[in-house]
Regions:
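N-terminal signal-anchor transmembrane alpha helix of single-pass membrane proteins
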Residues: 1-33
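Charged, low-complexity intrinsically disordered regions
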Residues: 29-59, 67-191
């Protein structure tokens, strides 16, 4: 049993290392981002990614990457995370419309329509309080920042605000807009 566990750990480590080598480290872009927004760049090691941590609205927002092994391949994602004081217990997920979300809708998956046609047609919004989501997403600046992301999965669950997108994001203006998005969301959620 112990040798099998060691083998699994070694295989996961190899997958992570290969993924980092294939996708490249975002260090140069992330150092620039940290400098531009007054954040801290923390260099990664062999088995952990580099990260950027910024204080946004008195919360620590962390940018990093993670890799999910599956079968003989793996997928790498860029993510941002922050704790949030979620007094109302609101939970939601916002993602771009795609084939799977359209199939889900056809099979009865709920999509919260906020009443703004271009946003409603481009995004799948799910959550536990439709009125709160409509109020939150009525904010033009918030919608603009969400719409500026070509790939997005933004969620609030419990006390964590979370963004993820496939691949390693090295585009500094896009990363800045993600930190701005978190700032606007933290303002609205903790008001």
């Amino acid at each position: 049993m112990t040798s099998a566990l060691v083998l699994i750990v070694v295989l996961i480590a190899v997958v992570v290392i290969v993924a980092l080598l294939v996708t490249g480290r975002p260090d140069a872009a992330w150092k620039q981002l940290a400098s531009d927004i007054g954040a801290e760049f923390i260099k990664g090691g062999m088995l952990r990614s580099s990260k950027v941590q910024a204080q946004v609205k008195q919360r620590t927002v962390t940018l990093d990457i993670y890799t999910v092994p599956h079968g003989k391949s793996s997928s790498t994602y860029t993510r941002l995370r922050s704790s949030v004081q979620n007094r109302d217990g609101l939970e939601f997920t916002v993602s771009r419309e795609g084939l799977m979300s359209k199939v889900g809708k056809a099979l009865g998956s709920r999509d919260v329509e906020i009443g703004i046609s271009d946003f409603d047609s481009d995004f799948l919004v799910q959550g536990n309080n439709e009125n709160s989501l409509r109020t939150l997403l009525s904010d033009a600046k918030l919608r603009e920042l969400i719409q500026g992301q070509r790939s997005i999965r933004l969620s609030l669950k419990g006390e964590e605000l979370h963004f993820q997108a496939p691949g390693v994001i090295k585009d500094v203006p896009r990363l800045k807009s993600l930190f701005e998005l978190f700032g606007v969301l933290l303002d609205r959620l903790e008001a």
